[in-house]
């Protein structure tokens, strides 16, 4: 008897209030790294009706106009009208940054004879994941959820659906049979809109222009449930509808619930923070394991102690899909990937102003040129070391 189950993931658009906060935090991080790549940054953002609060800890030699960066980011997202609840021109922006604690800095900055022995910026555990459900080696539900809100933003920007506004949420439920995606069961899409669009016209346009062009044809079987703006009205949205905070969409940012999460958010954090850099490294490791043909699913856990460079643990789980044992793969990971914090920074070239682009539509599964953690350049080496044939997804 087939093992049949449903699995659901969600995403949110760049105009969702929590994503507005994430993008402001990462825009500030990028501006700082542009001038001083060794800065220590933990930039948190709160946004509400007509108000942005910037707080956190920053130690840098950079001279940054934080208020202007916040306004520019809000403008780029599309909040350029007071009717939307926040307007880049008129919103208040409060700045309250401190410097990084010297107690933390002494552990992070300390170096030994090996200059890669920079300590971790905090304790914690991080996960990376990859699977062969999509060419990008991502779980299908989160991948489709991202593409839906990405298309919503594209049609809003190009004016094809001029009544769209920046805030939107998507949710995709996929039916799995024997562990593989079989069909799409339900799609939910809620989009902010102008007050004069009638609900039937909105629903038809969203289904025909946003949802159907995004779904893979081979997974459209039978009657899919389309739930578009199921409350009936979504005029008030963005930071006016809900207070936005940095770091509140950590499952959207990663694997949509298909893999565990260590709990640490990404946006606004420089790469000395292993919450971010080690999660990126975990994705890099997992993706190369799957691309190498060592397994069709791979979950990586790494953990750290503050001020200590070497991970306190490295774990690999391939859920029974491995062509060699998990113990062998773990050994290969330790041999071929430097998972010390500074080793990760060097391996993935993370001291670059690349982070604002990560802050909407997923940190993983998008093969942008800046996203070094999406490369599969270690796959051939891993396959050769394990004695298996790599998959075709090696780049």
From Swiss-Prot:
Q: Which residues form a coiled coil?
A: none
The protein's annotated catalytic reaction(s) are: L-methionine + ATP + H2O = S-adenosyl-L-methionine + phosphate + diphosphate
Its UniProt pathway annotation is: Amino-acid biosynthesis; S-adenosyl-L-methionine biosynthesis; S-adenosyl-L-methionine from L-methionine: step 1/1
BP terms from Gene Ontology: one-carbon metabolic process; S-adenosylmethionine biosynthetic process
Q: Where does Mg(2+) bind?
A: 18
Name the cofactor(s) required for activity, per the record. Mg(2+); K(+)
Pfam families, per database record: S-AdoMet_synt_C, S-AdoMet_synt_M, S-AdoMet_synt_N
Tell me, in one coarse class, where this protein mainly resides.
Answer: cytoplasm
Relate the protein's function as given in its record.
Catalyzes the formation of S-adenosylmethionine (AdoMet) from methionine and ATP. The overall synthetic reaction is composed of two sequential steps, AdoMet formation and the subsequent tripolyphosphate hydrolysis which occurs prior to release of AdoMet from the enzyme.
Name of protein? S-adenosylmethionine synthase
Origin organism lineage? Bacteria, Pseudomonadati, Pseudomonadota, Betaproteobacteria, Burkholderiales
